[in-house]
A protein has these predicted regions:
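Residues forming well-ordered secondary-structure scaffolds
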Residues: 3, 20-24, 49, 53
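A cross-domain feature marking catalytic cores of carbohydrate-active enzymes
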Residues: 10-12, 41, 69-75, 96-97, ...
Length: 216
C-alpha cells in the first residue's frame, strides 16, 4: 500500500482444498511479505460449505496477527454471495469478467448480478472501504467463447475495464495467458498483452494488476 510500491496477491492454492495445507502455504507466503493486496484462493471445490470453511480460516489468521489485508475465495460470484449470506467473513467478492454481454453470459453473470454482489459485500462484508470487488480478465477469453463479435482481443479487453470501473473495484487483474491462451502464440505475445492491458487499465483509471500465467 505504499506509494511507488507494488502490492501482490498471496495465492495458497491446494489440490484438495485441505485447510491445513492451505494454511501452510499461506503462512509461508506471509513470511515473504506477500499478500498485502489480498489473500485469495482458487478453490477446487466450488461449494458454499468449502468456500465458507476457507474464508473462516483466512479470517482467523488475519485477525490473530492483525494483518492489514483482504480475504477472498475465487469461486463463482453466486457461490461467494451465498457464503456471505450464511455468515462467511469476506472482504472482496471475485468474478472473472468479459468485454461483451455474450462473454459474460458464458461466465454466468450480468451487470445486475455484479451490482447485487457489490451491494451485498458493502452491507454484510468485512471491508472497511468502499471498494469490495475483485475482477480478473485476460486477452482472448471472448474469442474462446465466440463472444467477440469480430473485434480483436485488445478491443474486447479494453471493454472489460470499462465494465469493471462501473463497480468501483478494489483490484482488476489481467490474467494474461490463462483464459484464451490459444490466442497468444508465445512468451513475447504474453508480455505484449500484459503491457497493453496494464496501460489500458491505468488509462481507464482502475487499480490494475497483472497475473503472470502461461498455460499454452
Amino acid at each position: 500500500g505504499l506509494p511507488g510500491t507494488l502490492s501482490c496477491r498471496l495465492q495458497p492454492n491446494h489440490p484438495t482444498d485441505d485447510p491445513d495445507g492451505i494454511m501452510a502455504s499461506l503462512l509461508e507466503g506471509l513470511t515473504f511479505g506477500a499478500g498485502d493486496a489480498v489473500l485469495g484462493l482458487n478453490p477446487v471445490d466450488d461449494s458454499v460449505e468449502s468456500v465458507r470453511r476457507v474464508l473462516d480460516r483466512f479470517q482467523e489468521i488475519k485477525s490473530r496477527w492483525d494483518i492489514p489485508t483482504q480475504i477472498c475465495v475465487l469461486a463463482h460470484v453466486t457461490t461467494q454471495m451465498e457464503a456471505v449470506r450464511k455468515g462467511a467473513p469476506c472482504d472482496l467478492i471475485f468474478q472473472s469478467i468479459a468485454g461483451s454481454q455474450k462473454g459474460n453470459e458464458a461466465f454466468g453473470l450480468d451487470g445486475k448480478l455484479i451490482e447485487e454482489a457489490r451491494q451485498l459485500a458493502l452491507r454484510e462484508g468485512n471491508a472497511t472501504g468502499p471498494n469490495v470487488m475483485y475482477f480478473e480478465t485476460g486477452q482472448g477469453s471472448e474469442l474462446s467463447s465466440e463472444a467477440h463479435h469480430g473485434a480483436d482481443q485488445v478491443v474486447m479487453e479494453a471493454r472489460c475495464y470499462g465494465f469493471a470501473k462501473r463497480f468501483q473495484p478494489f483490484l482488476v487483474n489481467t490474467v494474461v495467458g490463462f483464459i484464451g491462451p490459444e490466442y497468444l502464440y508465445n512468451s513475447k505475445q504474453v508480455i505484449r498483452a500484459g503491457l497493453e492491458d496494464h496501460f489500458m487499465g491505468k488509462l481507464t483509471g482502475i487499480p490494475m494488476g497483472c497475473d503472470a500465467c502461461y498455460t499454452n
